[in-house]
């Protein structure tokens, strides 16, 4: 395809793979881009899998990263991480129609709608592959819990539900997520990792307050977790991070009836307007 002004080119290498990947995604318009930042474990295995995709809007020096479905299975029903991806895609549609020129100039927003696609699409349990990735470069290629495997506070965990491998970042998808964030840091950075369904916020209290207000969440935990994505993210200079645990739903219909999409959109827009 044609390389146009504003196209994004990403070169990446990953463990056990010497091939560089070149992604060229022409911008949809001057301020809106969609692209790829890596491959899932099953793609490295050569058995299906998915590219890791992102959406981007804005040109500002304040950067907001919204990550969804780091666990393809949460703990309500099979493949319920898909609800988080649905919310991500709906927020992307909303931003394209509602982000003001002022916010576009102040902010760059990155949305990662499904950072563990193998878990969501090919997994089978919330106690192992599904919650975790399906294929990693850990011993026996066992699936990794991406939200326990980041380098800051990393702890070796052996259960299938929370397996962290023999060292940090043995999930291909976690490596790619880390590199994507580091490649795209701004002057100020805000990282939000969206989960279900524990009805609480974790990490930065101020960031959490926007979502507690909209969702009626009463509980906040001020620590950042061992090996959590937000624990690593806050080690980046000038970065605030927060994990959002949405209140539980039992179906897509319930999520729709309770207005989760609108609540999330409102909370995030309030955040953008407040900083």
Range-by-range predicted roles:
Residues 73-222, 248:
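Active-site/substrate-binding loop(s) of hydrolase catalytic cores
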Residues 3, 45-48, 56-60, 102-105, ...:
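Extracellular/periplasmic catalytic domains that process cell-envelope and extracellular macromolecules
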Residues 1-9:
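Short nucleic-acid-contacting surface segments enriched for D/E, G, S/T with interspersed K/R
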Residues 52-62, 69-70:
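Short beta-strand-to-loop junctions in surface cap/lid or active-site-entrance loops
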Residues 12-31:
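OB-fold/S1-family single-stranded nucleic acid-binding modules
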Residues 15-16, 191, 200-214, 222-275:
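Active-site-adjacent mobile loop/cap segments within catalytic or ligand-binding domains
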Residues 49-52, 129-132, 177, 224-233:
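Alpha-helical scaffolding within the catalytic cores
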Residues 27-54:
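A non-catalytic alpha/beta surface segment that caps or lines the substrate-entry region
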């Amino acid at each position: 395809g044609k390389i146009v002004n504003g196209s994004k080119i990403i070169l990446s290498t990953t463990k056990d793979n010497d091939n560089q990947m070149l992604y060229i995604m022409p911008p949809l318009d001057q301020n809106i881009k969609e692209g790829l930042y890596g491959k899932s474990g099953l793609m490295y295995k050569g058995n299906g899998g998915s590219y890791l995709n992102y959406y981007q809007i804005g040109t500002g020096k304040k950067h907001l990263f919204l990550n969804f479905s780091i666990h393809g299975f949460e703990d309500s029903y099979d493949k319920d991480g898909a609800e988080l991806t649905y919310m991500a895609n709906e927020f992307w549609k909303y931003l394209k129609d509602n982000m003001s020129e002022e916010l576009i100039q102040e902010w760059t927003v990155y949305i990662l709608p499904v950072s563990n696609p193998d878990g969501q699409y090919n997994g089978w349990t919330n106690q192992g592959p599904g919650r975790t990735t399906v294929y990693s470069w850990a011993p026996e290629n066992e699936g990794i819990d991406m939200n326990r495997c980041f380098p800051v506070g990393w702890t070796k965990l052996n259960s299938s539900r929370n397996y962290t491998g023999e060292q940090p970042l043995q999930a291909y998808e976690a490596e790619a997520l880390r590199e994507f964030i580091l490649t795209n840091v701004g002057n100020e950075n805000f990282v939000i990792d969206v989960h279900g369904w524990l009805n609480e916020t974790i990490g930065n209290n101020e960031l959490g307050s926007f979502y507690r207000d909209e969702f009626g969440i009463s509980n906040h935990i001020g620590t950042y977790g061992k090996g959590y994505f937000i624990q690593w993210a806050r080690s980046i200079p000038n970065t605030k991070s927060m994990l959002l645990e949405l209140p539980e739903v039992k179906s897509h219909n319930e999520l729709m009836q309770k207005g989760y999409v609108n609540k999330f959109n409102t909370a995030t827009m309030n955040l953008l307007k407040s900083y």
